[in-house]
Design a protein with these regions (language model features):
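Beta/alpha (TIM)-barrel catalytic core signal, keyed to glycine-rich beta->alpha loops juxtaposed to Asp/Glu
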Residues: 1-154
Length: 155
């Protein structure tokens, strides 16, 4: 977590840190990590920006993963209400960013980077289509668009 990184960052003196961050799980700023990164001009690489695919709207019904699959411990995959909200948000992202080839990914990923000049995200890409989709990302959102995306997932 960003909070845990802050507990050790001074002693470790890293060049780059890798916290969890997505539009649902986001303590990057509230933990003080953003301020530290900006002040010390460090690199940052966010992992789980799609929350294991959950935020893409790909899952419309609760899903059970096989034993050993890291997603089996993510309770949100079983939350019918949340899955409906995510599906609705997917539609809203598609409408707002209709001119982007991957509007959902654009909103979810690029909203994390709009004010992070030394940042990147780690996307788990398992096939050529996912690599091609990822290659369309990186066009920064405006502060207004980034805030709109985050607001979709904050309620």
């Amino acid at each position: 977590s960003s909070e845990k990184i802050m507990d050790f960052i001074i002693r470790c003196d890293p060049d780059v840190v890798q916290p969890l961050r997505n539009v649902v799980d986001d303590t990057y700023e509230s933990s003080g990590l953003k301020n530290y990164i900006d002040t010390h001009n460090l690199g940052i690489c966010f992992f789980s920006p799609l929350k294991h695919g959950l935020l893409t709207g790909k899952y419309t019904e609760p899903v059970t993963f096989t034993n050993g699959d890291h997603r089996s411990g993510v309770k949100e995959f079983q939350d019918t209400t949340l899955l409906k909200i995510i599906l609705s948000n997917k539609t809203l992202l598609e409408q707002r960013f209709f001119n982007h080839p991957n509007p959902v990914l654009h909103g979810l990923v690029d909203s994390l980077l709009f004010d992070v000049p030394t940042g990147c995200v780690l996307l788990g890409q398992r096939n050529v289509q996912q690599v091609q989709a990822a290659s369309t990302l990186g066009k920064l959102l405006t502060a207004k668009d980034a805030e709109w995306v985050k607001t979709l997932y904050s309620s």
